[in-house]
Structures are given as C-alpha cells and as structure tokens.
Amino acid sequence: MYILGIESSCDDTCAAVVKDGRELVSNCVASSAAEQNLYGGVVPEIASRRHIEHISQVARAALDEAGTALDEIGGVAVTFAPGLIGAVLVGLNFAKGLALSAQKPLIPVHHLRGHIAALYLTHPELEPPFLCLVASGGHSHIVRVQDYTHFEVLGRTVDDAAGEAFDKVARTLGLGYPGGPAVSRAAQTGDPKAYPLPTPHVEGPYNVSFSGLKTAVLNLVNKAQMKGERVNVADMAASFQFRITDILAEKLLLAAQDTGAKQICIAGGVAANGLLRETLAAGAKKLGARLYLPELQLCGDNAAMVAAQGFYEYRAGNTADLNLNGLATLGIDYL
C-alpha cells in the first residue's frame, strides 16, 4: 500500500511516498531555513507563506519521483499536530483537498509519532516495543513505544527542548540557524571541558531541563563582554554540546536500565548529533541493548516519516473526515 505523506509543521514543506510503512519510495523537501536564518530563527508568518508557495509543487514532485499516480495512493497522511498552527493548517488543508478530490482516506499523524516512524524506514526489522528518545526543536521526550499507535511518555523536558536550547545557544554565540548543525561544526575544534557547565536537577528520574544550561552559556558570554573579553566560541560550543548530549544519553540509558529494554532508539532533529550517537552507542553496548539510529536525512522534519506512521494509523483504523482540525499542542500519547 502506498501512502502519500504531507508535512508542514515548521519551516520545511515536505511530501513523500512510502510503501507499506517501511519502504521509502520518494522524499521531497523545500526548506525556508536560509531565509529564516536572516531573522535568527523561524518566523511563523514567513514559514506559512513559503508553505503556500511550495506545497503543490513538492507534492507533485513526490508523486513524480515515485512514479505513482494519485489514484494509486492508498491514503493521504498529514501532520495535524503539534506545530506552528499557521504552518500546520497549510499542509492539513492541502491534504484535505487531495483526499477529497481523489476520494482517498485522510490519515491524521502526530508529528512526534512520525519522527519515531522514521526508524522503520532505516531499520525495517525494528518492531515495538522499544524505548525512544525524541529530541527536536520543540520537544524532548523519552517514550515507551508499546505498539505502532500506543505510546507512553516516561520523561520529558520541564522547560526548553533540546533543539530549542541548541538554537538559542547558537544565536548567543553568533553561529546562525539552525543551531544544532552550527553548534556541532563549531565544537569540532573546541575543548568540551573548557567551560564546566551545570547539569540541572529536576523531579522525575527521566525528566530533563535545559533552560538553566542555556542561561549559563548566556551568563558566561555576558560576563566576558562586560570585562571587554570574548569567550572562545569553539570551546563554548563543545562544552555545551558535551553537557546536553551527556544529559540526554544518561536519561535514556537510565530508562532502558530500569525498564529492561533491549531496543533503544533516538529520533528527531537532535538525533543527527554525532556526539549523541557515539555516547549512546557506547552506553547501549554496556547495557547489552541494541541501538537504532535513523538515517541523517530522516532526522529533521520530512514527510517520509509522516507517510510511514500514516500506514500504521490507517491499519489501526485511525482516519479522519474533513472536519479534522490542526492543533498547536497535543501529547504523543493522545487517544
């Protein structure tokens, strides 16, 4: 069964075709990141306007690349939550129009469920149950994936998401947007022990907090400026990256140890971070667990993940009518 996926929850306009939830057939993305970089981050109004301009061409490109006609598609899967509401609505309304005109099922997909489903495209052998750290610009969750459509949140951020912290620290250091890749590049020549940044303590064994870590970087930069000095950007980037990836890895590995999970995964934009991947690989080996990592091209926002999860939502009977509304916030464990 072929599923057409549509994703527009942030600044990337995406469409893809996936077969049977596991086989990536096409994957097309039009990004406005370069334009957003001029403003130091995502401007929702600009993101929505670019989605309107690009979405029909991107969807057509995905079908053409797949060599598939719209009438051969089994359903139209679309991100309906969470995300920038204006951006979400562009993709949702486009998907409604496609589903109506082609008389195909409309399949609502939660954005974070989609990130997890990207793992099925990289690892067709992976099946629930497993533990997954989902870390992106807007979310940081440790999730027990019980089956393809049932999720239990074990831990979450109590303030800033990991990707958000990367973006804000990158802006503080003058590294540009998106912050994750920018910080990682700067950190390559830095000393991760140069600045001893704090490890915030929060209630809940698997919860995380990054607001204090972000503020610690800002304070060090401001203090240096007040003295007429400058922090070493490479060292600060390396120190921040070391601390935040250490926190994320520690929490996921603790959850795996406590639950006895033998399959652990990461997903979302932060899953592309090389140091996080290395740290988790070493930790998983010590636990005797297998670590599953998504392909780098499937870490950030894309529609392939939406189409993959859409297949399982459809199989579970989770379709919607044209009254489906977009939501800015919604837990991954919604019923």
Please provide the spans of the model-predicted regions.
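N-terminal beta-alpha supersecondary unit
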Residues: 2-82, 111, 115, 236
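Short beta-strand scaffold segments in enzyme catalytic cores
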Residues: 13-18, 132-134, 140-144
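Short Gly/Thr/Asp-enriched flexible loops that form oxyanion-binding sites at enzyme active sites
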Residues: 78-104, 274-283
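Conserved phosphate-binding/catalytic loops in two-lobed NTP-binding clefts
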Residues: 108-109, 281-306
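Conserved phosphate-binding catalytic cores of ATP/NTP-utilizing and phosphoryl-transfer enzymes
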Residues: 109-131
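Glycine-rich phosphate-binding/hydrolytic loop that grips phosphoryl groups
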Residues: 115, 294-334
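Glycine-rich phosphate-binding loop plus the immediately following alpha-helix
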Residues: 124, 146-191, 214-215, 219-223, ...
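A contiguous, well-structured pocket-lining segment that forms one wall/lid of small-molecule binding clefts
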Residues: 185-264, 274-287, 314, 334-335
